Amino acid sequence: MNTMGILRRLSELGDVFTKKEAQEKLGMSTKQLNYYLEALLREGFLRRVTKGIYTLSLEPGRTSSPHEFVLGQLLVPNGAVAYWSALNYYGMTEQIPRTVFIQTPVKKDYRKLLIVDGKRFKVIVVSPEKFFGISTIRLGRREVRITDPEKTIVDCLDKPKYCGGIIEVLKALKNARLDYEKLLEYAERMKSKAVLKRLGFLSGRLGLGIEKEIRLSEGDRKSFALLDPSMPPEGRFNYRWGLRINVPDDYWEEVE
């Protein structure tokens, strides 16, 4: 098969693919595959985005940059778009994060920040028990995993620093259409009292009613978590929820 025949076969994978996918598609040896990939790179039909990932165009020199979510899926095959990136995708925040946040239960030596094809990726490794509530969306020919809206909120309650702070969670709770029963179920499934405390406090502040279903023991209330762990440990104590409200009083003005 000549290089143009190989190109047509590869185009069936879409405009971005991995070397592993190409080998499975073409059914050839690594040596043969490397030969054709290098030939197509020289002719301008392919562009190497990073090790093992290529973009393709049927017009030489016209390869495009893949969608950041698609690239994130290829970089972290066992992951899902999450936190601030998922908040933005669902329209739960007007903020546009400069970094794509990917959650994965698979421990690997990921760098703190990956920069690939001019895009920034932050990989957050969580325990397998916290990796649930995953949906699938289609972008071009690719399916991409993303946390569903309720899991996105719960993850942001768990790690507010990956969503722009607790204020972004408050905005999302106020403006988004959410299944509150599922939201509470997910919060309980996280096995984190801090998540339940933050959810209860914010729900009470917005009058959502979720707070009425949250049960905390006296011991839970005497062990104080920070409302926003991304901010300094200061501020008044809330004994109803066992929280230290470490945000200024005018913090809520733009929302309420």
Where are these regions (language model features)?
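Phosphate-binding glycine-rich loops and adjacent basic patches that engage nucleotide phosphates
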Residues: 1-3, 30, 43-52, 112-119, ...
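Short beta-edge/loop segments at beta->alpha junctions of small alpha/beta modules
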Residues: 1-78, 177-193
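Residue-level marker of positions within ordered structural domains that often coincide
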Residues: 27, 91-92, 158, 204
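A residue-level signal for conserved active-site and pocket-lining positions in enzyme catalytic cores
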Residues: 22, 86, 153
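Hydrophobic alpha-helical interaction segments
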Residues: 134-256
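Short gly/ser-rich loop at a beta-strand->alpha-helix junction or flexible surface loop bordering the NTP-binding
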Residues: 19, 38, 43, 48-61, ...
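N-proximal short alpha-helices
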Residues: 6, 13, 56-59, 122-127, ...
